[in-house]
Design a protein with these regions (language model features):
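N-terminal pre-catalytic "stem/leader" segment of glycosyltransferase-like enzymes
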Residues: 1-49, 223-254
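Active-site proximal beta-strand in glycosyltransferases
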Residues: 40-42, 58-87
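Short alpha-helical segment that forms part of, or immediately flanks, the ligand-binding pocket
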Residues: 189, 212-218
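Membrane-proximal helix-turn-helix segments that form the acceptor-binding/catalytic region
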Residues: 82-103, 112, 193
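A short, active-site helix/loop in glycosyltransferases that binds the activated sugar's phosphate group
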Residues: 98-122, 162
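Nucleotide-sugar-dependent
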Residues: 200-211, 227, 231-233
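A short alpha->beta transition loop at the rim of the catalytic pocket in nucleotide-sugar-dependent
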Residues: 196, 219
Length: 259
């Protein structure tokens, strides 16, 4: 199962491919030659690009940052600091953000936090994750699934998803959760659709939380920590089911055209 950032990137590439010539590569495989051959660069995960590589992009090409996980903070979690104000000593890559033609973020809270910590950055919030129309259709087809189970949690080895903390909550409340870990995306969504509720306890400020949005599109009640959920900062957060699917379809179309 692809993570949220990877799924977003995949859907963006899929949208752009028919419109222009695209070369994609992992950050650790980026070369000067590839930069030189590009007219414009969309930078997503740049964690493995050496500092001199970022400077070269910054100095030679127009570029857009598609921001997923607060790479202007050393620990990649602005929620670790009061009011999301990151100490100067804990900031990184700030010039790279400032010099970008535009920085696309996924939620309003992430726009506010980035602007607060890296002023004069040109930030645009798309207010959503990216899904394909086929995925929206599939989620919609699951709306009438019988809710046979009470509560589900995300089974993930990624520590920021707080799987163990979710298990502790369930144990304390005498709940036997359905654990979502299916590698096939459609199976993952179908299993989620069989539940009444989802528990998700983010360990950091989630830039959006794709899985939380999917739970609400499927009509589940979401138990979470809203202050650490990018999705919760959006004015469609209280929607669910078909209404939320419709809102996300519209936002996805607008987001893709913005690129």
């Amino acid at each position: 199962l692809l993570g949220g950032a990877e799924s977003n990137d995949h859907n963006l590439i899929r949208h752009l491919n028919p419109r222009c010539s695209i070369t994609s590569c992992s950050s650790h495989k980026l070369t000067k030659d590839l930069v030189d051959k590009s007219d414009i660069i969309i930078v997503s995960n740049f964690i493995n690009v050496p500092p001199e590589g970022l400077v070269y992009i910054q100095d030679t090409k127009p570029y857009i940052i598609y921001e997923h996980d607060h790479k202007y903070v050393k620990n990649r979690d602005p929620s670790a600091y009061p009011n999301f104000i990151v100490p100067e000593s804990e900031k990184v890559n700030t010039e790279f953000y400032k010099k970008a033609k535009k920085v696309f973020v996924l939620s309003e809270i992430c726009k506010e936090v980035l602007e607060k910590n890296v002023p004069s950055t040109n930030v645009h919030s798309i207010g959503c994750s990216l899904w394909s129309e086929e995925t929206f259709d599939y989620i919609e087809s699951l709306l009438n699934e019988q809710k046979e189970n009470d509560l589900c949690i995300l089974k993930s080895s990624n520590p920021i998803k707080n799987y163990n903390k979710s298990l502790e909550y369930c144990k304390e409340n005498n709940i036997v959760p359905v654990e979502l870990s299916e590698p096939i995306y459609q199976d993952f969504l179908k299993k989620m659709a069989s539940c009444e509720r989802m528990l998700f306890i983010p360990g950091v400020l989630e830039t959006f939380s794709r899985v939380s949005a999917e739970a609400k599109m499927l009509g589940l009640k979401l138990l979470t920590t809203p202050k650490r959920l990018g999705f919760a900062s959006e004015n469609i957060y209280d929607q669910s089911g078909a209404d939320l699917i419709s809102s996300f379809r519209a936002r996805n179309r607008a987001a893709l055209e913005a690129f």
